[in-house]
Amino acid sequence: MAAGRPLAWTLTLWQAWLILIGPSSEEPFPSAVTIKSWVDKMQEDLVTLAKTASGVHQLVDIYEKYQDLYTVEPNNARQLVEIAARDIEKLLSNRSKALVRLALEAEKVQAAHQWREDFASNEVVYYNAKDDLDPEKNDSEPGSQRIKPVFIDDANFRRQVSYQHAAVHIPTDIYEGSTIVLNELNWTSALDDVFKKNREEDPSLLWQVFGSATGLARYYPASPWVDNSRTPNKIDLYDVRRRPWYIQGAASPKDMLILVDVSGSVSGLTLKLIRTSVSEMLETLSDDDFVNVASFNSNAQDVSCFQHLVQANVRNKKVLKDAVNNITAKGITDYKKGFSFAFEQLLNYNVSRANCNKIIMLFTDGGEERAQEIFAKYNKDKKVRVFTFSVGQHNYDRGPIQWMACENKGYYYEIPSIGAIRINTQEYLDVLGRPMVLAGDKAKQVQWTNVYLDALELGLVITGTLPVFNITGQFENKTNLKNQLILGVMGVDVSLEDIKRLTPRFTLCPNGYYFAIDPNGYVLLHPNLQPKPIGVGIPTINLRKRRPNVQNPKSQEPVTLDFLDAELENDIKVEIRNKMIDGESGEKTFRTLVKSQDERYIDKGNRTYTWTPVNGTDYSSLALVLPTYSFYYIKAKIEETITQARYSETLKPDNFEESGYTFLAPRDYCSDLKPSDNNTEFLLNFNEFIDRKTPNNPSCNTDLINRVLLDAGFTNELVQNYWSKQKNIKGVKARFVVTDGGITRVYPKEAGENWQENPETYEDSFYKRSLDNDNYVFTAPYFNKSGPGAYESGIMVSKAVEIYIQGKLLKPAVVGIKIDVNSWIENFTKTSIRDPCAGPVCDCKRNSDVMDCVILDDGGFLLMANHDDYTNQIGRFFGEIDPSLMRHLVNISVYAFNKSYDYQSVCEPGAAPKQGAGHRSAYVPSIADILQIGWWATAAAWSILQQFLLSLTFPRLLEAADMEDDDFTASMSKQSCITEQTQYFFDNDSKSFSGVLDCGNCSRIFHVEKLMNTNLIFIMVESKGTCPCDTRLLIQAEQTSDGPDPCDMVKQPRYRKGPDVCFDNNVLEDYTDCGGVSGLNPSLWSIIGIQFVLLWLVSGSRHCLL
């Protein structure tokens, strides 16, 4: 957070200016006393109007009158957070039991499985999840037979599923008819019975998945794969081994130093292959890992500003990708320099790191040097694994770099062409899994991931993972090791919605909420954890509605949002975060800044944070945040069915004329009553359900329904006994009332038909702001440059209803009005000229040539002006209307500001800033490379030739179909990015400000006056047309940004904790299998055919783009 509070000028300084230079016209500028008298009169008129027309006191009387219909219950924060934490523990524990059953069965079945080289025709029966996406696909591969399940719509999965079958997904670059795949399909079919049994024991289970180390994924229940017609080129790029949950479950955390050879021989195609390979390698790392990339020739250096290992989060990996994309090749190779540099950095324990697997990844075209003395010096005990990658087409002896890997418990890989990158940069996880397998039951610990986006469109989920080991003849005796392979990872999903149900919020008031964090400080649960959907860029109009949860099958990264980025950071929150990570319990009350729901405003409020650990899980702690006015809540006790029926009658659309246009918050009132985005439809369904089954039905949340009925009755009485009996009040376009229970009434009916606010009152920005303010809150409509004048809908004025029941403060509702802008302007103009003056400078005449009079709200948005051309800009940020004056208001402390970053945004390709350290979404090869068909043609031609010359004698058991990663579609998709937005707010108790805006050759006198009991200021200033000044716009709205400098952020990393256990070495490990001729290389004819397909796809894409 960046806050600006420049020193304010005093009234004395302003008076001195007036004496020295005088105003720009011959007539005197109105005195501060005169202006204040105008403002006081306007403020009195506005507050009286809002108070009288809204019926705020009348609603208080109604709540006090009917106290027999409700009780006031306490929100015991400590008790609530403890109960919720235990419920979450129980939920995750139940899911863990399902995982254990699956993992044990998988190991047992695979151990009993007899490997077969041949299968009879159609012997292996399974449902391929991608069958429905490719109607031209053959019904079956040799040895297999396809199942065609009958699917039904399922509300829990939000898609069609079949509980009778499991589905299989096989990556595009894996041949489905290969012997390995057929054997995998054969033995994993036994998991289907366990899947079904788990669901019988717990019908709320979501996806159950086994991800094989070979890339096959079997998941239950069966469901067609996502519609890849949404993806450019219709290429399915999913590989279970690259999903966040698989990466986390397959190996312990890693400290990785990637060492890149940039000598002169590494040039052209080889350098491009290395860049892509490093980028793919970075994608195999998660937030528990640490990484850096260094390059070397005759000298060694870091490729980026990072001078030590950094956390492998999304932002840091982007920095490294961009840096790698800019490396150049020159000089000669000195492996000693490179490895010395790598070991020194990798063994630096003075910085934050994973403190587990220590790895050096060498990417080179080969060489004659072995650097034995460096390994003898730094790695005598072989605690650091070295993996080597021979990249490109060359004639070097592979012996030296293969020796490096074999002598240092690593593995040697060859990447001769594009198609080998994807597989060979992820297979090192199998090697890191060896110590886990050898550790046996000690390593079989359920781990829970960060939040990420489910590939099958379930939304935001977390996944419990458990490694599955190959126990086939694992030990014949204590010393004769037979197997140390990881078969894969078992996963069970938990939807974030399931966790939210355990943290009920509808008694907390809209500004109360739960949140949970993991040991990295990332939030699992938080109202601001709302990533924007890929495919939706920065909106031209910032809607008040909260972003929907995202279903994006392309998302590979976890959705990582630090608690201190989810809220406005301060020292107390840093302390709370640290204590939560340490698993402590605690409570703290303090005053803090709060960003509004629509992210345009900053308010101040008292909050009490109460937190407790969530034991037995990977999530450190759960917290409950309550404002002072949420310590108690209303619990309705409408037991008589007659009263229930009378109140529900007021919700029927037929009664809108009498009761006002009514909106019902789309909540889960009953299990058989599904919320709808169509308000009228939902109201009809709600009333029909209540009439048929009564509010006391066992399938309903009785407290929720009774509260909504109570609010319906109270608000209807406000309409019937007060609003409807008032005569039409000039300047009032509408009246409204919004309640905690979920009722919104707008009167008259016609005004409700144009109501644009969120029917879910707990997510309504103006409602939440009103609760945190004691004043009347004026809210400007959203300005739309391309749309009609926003002012036509009126200015919203709202006020929280405060009641005290037995000394207990409650704010159960907000009332308000919408006022007509033209009437307001007319009224103020009359007010400002009641005392006639002699010249044009001394009042606020309509469309004055020399004087601008404006009213701004506490966010700096325009609400009223004496100029018609300003009127059409009502709702616009004033820094875009009169930027020089707005800057000056900041400089003299009328406004303070907060700059915040949104790490969950998406932007158009190329929209992100190009300068700075790597916050452009990096794809390697670059987009320019992708679109240059010559590069791909060269790559494919060399690859085909090399495969022909080198691979004839090394047919691969697992045949591959060459396919590049997401680089194909990068230039045609939205990209994740960082955006920044600045909120302005009052942070000064002074009521009046005066001064002179110096524009160099001229100046403008101004006076600012706050309107008491509101969130408004009045500004009278000499017209900007009389004195040209700085016209650079001051932007408040969301815009793309580099974000905080990552080079600075890694110097002071935030507090975190890694996993408690580490499996990085085992004395029984057999590391003689370290690559070489035993490696699995692509089949010749498969590679040749797919390389031509690759060329055709890319050239076709390029042709379409042209």
From Swiss-Prot:
Which Gene Ontology molecular function entries are recorded, alphabetically? calcium channel regulator activity; metal ion binding; voltage-gated calcium channel activity
Quote the PROSITE patterns the UniProt record gives. Answer: VWFA
Write out the GO cellular component annotations: L-type voltage-gated calcium channel complex; T-tubule
Recorded hits in InterPro entries, A to Z, give:
Ca_channel_alpha-2/delta, VDCC_a2/dsu, VWA_N, VWF_A, vWFA_dom_sf
Which SUPFAM superfamilies does the entry mention?
A: vWA-like
- BP-aspect Gene Ontology terms: calcium ion import across plasma membrane
Query: Which Pfam families does the entry link to?
Result: VGCC_alpha2, VWA, VWA_N
Provide the residues annotated with a glycan attachment (glycosylation).
N94, N138, N186, N326, N350, N615, N784, N891
Q: What is its main location?
A: membrane
Q: How is it modified after translation?
A: Proteolytically processed into subunits alpha-2-1 and delta-1 that are disulfide-linked.
Residues annotated for a divalent metal cation binding in this entry: D261, S263, S265
Localization: Membrane; Cell membrane
Membrane-protein topology: Single-pass type I membrane protein
Here the disulfide bonds are C406-C1062
Q: Hey, what tissues is this thing expressed in? A: Skeletal muscle.
Show where the record puts the motif MIDAS-like motif. Answer: 261-265
Where's the Cache domain? 448-539
Q: Where is the VWFA domain?
A: 255-432
Topology: which residues are Extracellular?
27-1076
Using the record, list the residue span of the signal peptide; answer none if the entry has no such feature.
Answer: 1-26
User: Keywords for this entry?
Assistant: Calcium, Calcium channel, Calcium transport, Cell membrane, Disulfide bond, Glycoprotein, Ion channel, Ion transport, Membrane, Metal-binding, Phosphoprotein, Signal, Transmembrane, Transmembrane helix, Transport, Voltage-gated channel
Q: What else is known?
A: Binds gabapentin, an antiepileptic drug.
* Record family assignment: Belongs to the calcium channel subunit alpha-2/delta family.
Question: PANTHER family, from UniProt?
Answer: VOLTAGE-DEPENDENT CALCIUM CHANNEL SUBUNIT ALPHA-2/DELTA-RELATED, VOLTAGE-DEPENDENT CALCIUM CHANNEL SUBUNIT ALPHA-2_DELTA-1
Binding partners and assembly: Dimer formed of alpha-2-1 and delta-1 chains; disulfide-linked. Voltage-dependent calcium channels are multisubunit complexes, consisting of alpha-1 (CACNA1), alpha-2 (CACNA2D), beta (CACNB) and delta (CACNA2D) subunits in a 1:1:1:1 ratio.
Protein name according to UniProt: Voltage-dependent calcium channel subunit alpha-2/delta-1
The gene name on file is CACNA2D1
